[in-house]
């Protein structure tokens, strides 16, 4: 009987999944925050309680290694610079810059999101209620990144959005709007792999440019450009 109990306890111990949770609430002129989480089911904010930074300048770098991790972050500030690195599957990112507040313009934004893995859900919003004067966003899915959903919304005067993904069965929802400046908006989209669903909306009174390169079978692409 003792042997049976010992085996059951060992199985329970080896199947436990530990998770780390981080909740950030920050206000002030400047924040430089680096977060690294290694493991499964870790969170930086969640669907009900987002982490938040309200200040003039935010530098935010997050590395998550593992599966089923969550990032939910709201930034209210004039300048945002950040890099998010994901290695693993079934991760969820919801990042908003211009979440409200007296310094919420998100006037200058430079964001990079790198992911390696499958079934990830990435939602990036910059300039939700006030246009970003300058936005430079890079989203990169490394080789073998399959069945991911990437949604990027940028409202600004001069937005440059570059998306490069190597994998199959990915879905892209891209919306770039705002009046634009003399340079207009630029979207550079490169996809390698089969079964890509791409929806692009680009609007602004000045010149807009889309460079789209796709390599693979069964791509469904819809593009709408308006002044």
Q: How does the language model describe each region?
A:
Residues 5, 13-19:
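Sec/Tat signal peptide C-region and signal peptidase I cleavage site
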Residues 1-9:
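Bacterial Sec-dependent N-terminal signal peptides
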């Amino acid at each position: 009987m003792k042997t049976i109990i010992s085996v059951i306890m060992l199985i329970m111990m080896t199947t436990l999944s530990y998770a780390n949770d981080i909740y950030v609430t920050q206000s002030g002129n400047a924040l430089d925050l680096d977060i690294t989480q290694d493991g499964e089911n870790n969170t930086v904010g969640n669907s009900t309680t987002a982490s938040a930074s309200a200040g003039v300048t935010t530098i935010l770098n997050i590395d998550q290694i593992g599966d089923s991790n969550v990032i939910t972050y709201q930034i209210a500030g004039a300048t945002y610079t950040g890099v998010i690195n994901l290695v693993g599957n079934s991760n969820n990112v919801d990042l908003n810059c211009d979440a409200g507040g007296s310094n919420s313009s998100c006037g200058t934004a430079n964001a990079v999101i790198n992911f390696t893995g499958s079934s990830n859900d990435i939602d990036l919003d910059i300039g939700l209620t006030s246009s970003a004067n300058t936005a430079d966003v890079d989203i990169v899915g490394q080789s073998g990144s399959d069945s991911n959903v990437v949604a990027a919304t940028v409202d600004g005067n001069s937005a440059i959005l570059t998306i490069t993904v190597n994998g199959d069965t990915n879905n892209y929802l891209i919306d770039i709007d705002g009046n634009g400046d003399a340079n207009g908006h630029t979207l550079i989209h490169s996809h390698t792999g089969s079964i890509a669903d791409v929806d692009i909306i680009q609007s602004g009174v000045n010149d807009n440019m889309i460079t789209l390169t796709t390599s693979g079978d069964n791509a469904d692409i819809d593009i709408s450009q308006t002044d």
